[in-house]
Amino acid sequence: MIETTDKSISHALKKAAASVVEEMLSTHVLAVEFLLQGMMTFKCRVRTENNDDVIVRFYPARRSSVVDHEPDLLMRCYRAGMTVPKPIGDSRSGPSAPLSYVAYRYINGETLADRLPSFDALRRQVAAEDLASHLYRLQSLTIEGAGEIVTSRAARNSSWDTFVEDAMFAGLVSIKNYKLLEPSLTSEIERVICAGPPAHASVTQRLIWGDINFGNILVNEDGRISGLIDFESCLGGDPLATLGYAAAIHGTEPFFSEFRQAWPQTLSVEEENLIAWYTLLRALRLACYAHLPLPTGRPRDPLVHIVPGIIPALRRLTAIH
């Protein structure tokens, strides 16, 4: 077992990644790099004498069960023509390793978070339109049930509305118990969730990208999307939640407005209100873990810094109740 506090973790995982790739692809490894990116998993980039370029992503011990669904979901998305990593193996049937893992071909590109500051207006527009198109296509994948997915095709709960309600009240309890937010903000959240959803979802049982943030979106030099990565925390439910989850992290940034304007479908007032509702959902789901370190052992930022979009979402929801 590898502990996240072990100073030699990068060395141990580089060694494990090399072994996995050599056995999986029957080749010799030339170089292994421990990537200092991502907060929920450990990533190694492995290059071989046969010009293979592979990412081995290790799940921390308390997230080991993710391997039971993420590789299959990635393959399902890939086969549907979506720009996601193509898995070539994982720890369920592949070579042994200290932690559960998925291995996939490296995707060229840099994160949108890194490239956006240097993009001119044209490339920002290209990125906004292409990202909107990619995310809109995600809702074509159906998920049986609701809430956290447990396989590539099914989620844990039966009712989306019940899942959302339970998650929100659980998050509120954590906020109160651990004093994660200012009392006035906590009271406002409680009033909003007690009033109930601003509308009812017209569509459910669709894939929701629960890991959406600009650090999980790869772009080319011209601004076009080259890959959507990290699908470990996806949900089944109202596809508008993907927009709400994005708004929680990036809703206060100018590019988010450009992205929203590029959305292929005109959104009604009720749908805009639901997006704000799902922004609150992401914040409250994170609240259940905000007092704990990340699965990788790194400390978390304060909740309101992680999800600044909660403030404008609350304003909107408060105004309609």
PLM segments and residue spans:
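Active-site Asp-x-Gly
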Residues: 205-208, 213-273
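Helix-rich C-terminal or lid/interface subdomains of diverse kinases
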Residues: 129, 244-321
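An alpha-helical support segment within catalytic cores of ATP-dependent transferases
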Residues: 8-28, 123-124, 129, 137-210, ...
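ATP-binding pocket architecture of kinase catalytic cores
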Residues: 32-158, 184, 202
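Short beta-strand segments
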Residues: 57-59, 88-89, 150, 207-210, ...
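Phosphate/pyrophosphate-binding loops and the adjoining catalytic core of nucleotide-dependent enzymes
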Residues: 1-4, 74, 318-321
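Short, surface-exposed alpha-helical segments at coil->helix boundaries
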Residues: 14-15, 71, 253-257
